[in-house]
Amino acid sequence: MIKKECMTAEWIKAISVRNKYKDLNLIEKVIRAMSLLEMLKLSGCPFCFKGGSALMLILGESAHRLSIDIDIICPPGTDIEPYLKDIEKFGFISKTLEERQQRDTNIPKSHSKFFYHIAYKNDDKPAYILLDVLYEDLQYHATEEVEIKGPFIELDNEPLMVTVPSADDILGDKLTAFAPNTSGIPYIKGGRDRSLEIIKQLYDVGKLFEHADNFQHTKDTFTQIGKIELQYRGLPAELSLIYEDIRETALCLATRGQMGKGDFNMLQSGIKKIDGYIYKGKYRIEEAIVDSARAAYLATSIEKSSTRIEKYDGNLNTLLAMELSPSVNNKLNKLKKVLPEAFFYWVKTSELLQK
């Protein structure tokens, strides 16, 4: 389990110095989120850990984005309340819990806030960690057990294990979320700007793309979750809507708003905001264009029933004979010199669309 000293100001500040990352608030939130995860595991709650925070465990040292919410899936009909009783033992002072149906959707969720006293500064106002529970049968084809550990925490014994989707499965899940006009996170929700959340999905798709190696699992999970998300939103159960949405959003990024159905200003805003959540490196528009090209290629590969995906090998000679098919706009040729990897995936996308 996580050592108690990890929730002290001294520890949080030491972690900040060690990682050259200044946001003490986010460091503490990551530690508290992992503590909440330990509580859920020890309570016996039946769950699968998913979402951005799960990627910190799935990707290990390759995970450079911090996530501070705990997203889990529980079987339909689960009563979550009995599993949330030991909050004081895990550093929390109170909680709120509400069952809800999200507005304008039929998504069965519960939403909780777990409050704690801030350790790194003297402040009477408590902070909180969010727990989102989705009550649904698992749509993943493979799960695995991973250790609860990370660069911000230290353990006093063997790490606890939690169930997470495979990298291939969660890639399919995340890909459906990068479709802001259909199955994914919308630009605006409840009057709030959600551009940061959209870009978080894109960033995760890019990271997972580098680790996934079972395209069939990615394809199957995308297909199942995509249909469910369309149903939740009252949209026709036509996956073609999602494929097109992903490509149009990627095209909007690739041409910096000149083409594609998307809100480039909001996407650009999300790219600027995500930097605060990345504790190693930066995420710029150029990286987002590459990741969105990967997303477009993945979505099109699923649409066209490909059996495998090809990955760019970094060799510029690979691009010499490559040309865009007429199925995509030739303005994307500009990527060949400036972002060769993005160009590679747009060529592959265009070839699939041309068939």
Predicted regions and their residues:
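Active-site nucleotide-donor binding segment shared across nucleotidyl transfer reactions
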Residues: 37-70, 74-76
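Short catalytic/ligand-binding loop motif for oxyanion handling, primarily in non-cytosolic enzymes
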Residues: 56-58, 64, 81, 139-142
